[in-house]
């Protein structure tokens, strides 16, 4: 019996640390130490032939939905097997710091700035004990891809600046009447800039966010704004550490969050979700010929069973796979708010119909 138990233990350890060669959406995903990867709401940076996955480090229970550790980093050469690189951005024990323990840091994304040979991280930032009222975005930098990252600041973007797609008529609008939330009159007012005007002086709200670097090196910050009712796409400066003041509103009063953006054959696509808290809902697909142009709604990109809840997940990032022309991976989170650390990852290949429209189908297991 002792021999059998020894063999079983050896087999289980061997299995735990065995090399992965496929994606298994929703399954436990062990790192090189056999521990479930802890990088929620994350994104990928491909640098010098290595993939770096940055995400929220969650802890046990509901309290784990607040940030108690920081932003975790993992590295991989093949996207299947990941090495724990530790905490890239640590939160502070200083109770006077905006990024103190117990604040909220969500959806961290990292891009590389060639001009300064510097890695730049942006994230959604909420202040400790303030719920989701602050709606700020934070930025941190490092000379080393895996960190440590130094937090620079957190802001409400584009203070004192109108969106470039606002007409003179919209800028001149006056909202004096108290409107009932979700009434048709209220929705019309939102489309006309009700919340843009409200937040004009202090800066706009920035919650769920993504980053995108275009072919010409221009970087953009995409975020849910205006009480999660409207998306904003903001241009970043040449250092990627601040806003230029050029931004547009997208899908006003559309109630989108969890943006993820990619480009194929000169056309931009964005996948978002609706706003139902931690609960999943149907994904939304939009497209545009210019990132700062007019975005058109296409519909739900998901097909098959549970398409109406995005296979029980929410988008976080879309990865263009280097060396695989036209290959994109849809990355999403399956949240477990009652035990945050147990959140799972849903990675699926983006497919394209004959007209070039992206779509998703569930796969229990797949490889590229």
Q: Which sequence ranges carry the predicted segments?
A:
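Bacterial Sec-dependent N-terminal signal peptides
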Residues: 1-20
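Carbohydrate-active catalytic/glycan-binding domains of CAZyme proteins
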Residues: 18-368
């Amino acid at each position: 019996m002792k021999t059998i138990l020894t063999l079983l233990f050896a087999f289980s350890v061997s299995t735990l640390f065995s090399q992965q060669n496929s994606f298994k959406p929703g399954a436990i995903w062990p790192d090189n130490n056999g521990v479930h990867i802890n990088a929620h709401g994350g994104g990928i940076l491909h640098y010098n032939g290595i993939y770096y996955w940055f995400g929220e480090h969650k802890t046990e229970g509901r309290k784990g939905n607040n940030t108690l550790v920081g932003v975790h980093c993992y590295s991989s050469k093949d996207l299947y097997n990941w090495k724990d690189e530790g905490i890239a951005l640590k939160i502070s024990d200083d109770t006077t710091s905006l990024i103190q323990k117990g604040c909220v840091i969500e959806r961290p994304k990292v891009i590389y700035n060639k001009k300064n040979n510097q890695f730049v991280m942006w994230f959604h930032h909420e202040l400790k004990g303030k719920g989701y009222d602050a709606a700020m975005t934070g930025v941190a930098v490092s000379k080393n891809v895996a960190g440590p990252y130094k937090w620079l600041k957190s802001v409400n973007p584009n203070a004192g600046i109108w969106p470039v797609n606002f007409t003179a008529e919209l800028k001149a609008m006056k909202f004096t009447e108290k409107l009932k939330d979700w009434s048709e009159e209220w929705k019309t007012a939102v489309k006309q800039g009700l919340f843009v005007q409200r937040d004009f002086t202090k800066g706009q709200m920035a919650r769920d966010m993504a980053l995108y670097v275009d072919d010409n090196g221009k970087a953009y910050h995409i975020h849910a704004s205006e009480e999660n009712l409207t998306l904003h796409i903001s241009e970043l400066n040449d250092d990627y550490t601040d806003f230029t003041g050029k931004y547009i509103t997208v899908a006003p009063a559309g109630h989108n969050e969890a943006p993820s953006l990619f480009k194929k054959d000169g056309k931009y696509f964005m996948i978002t979700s609706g706003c139902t808290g931690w609960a999943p809902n149907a994904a939304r697909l939009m497209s545009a010929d210019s990132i700062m142009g007019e975005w058109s709604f296409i519909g739900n990109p998901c097909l098959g069973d549970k398409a109406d809840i995005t296979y029980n997940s929410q988008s976080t990032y879309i990865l263009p796979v280097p060396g695989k022309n036209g290959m994109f991976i849809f990355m999403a989170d399956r949240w477990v708010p009652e035990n945050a650390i147990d959140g799972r990852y849903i990675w699926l290949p983006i497919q394209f119909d004959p007209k070039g429209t992206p779509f998703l189908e569930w796969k229990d297991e797949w490889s590229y």
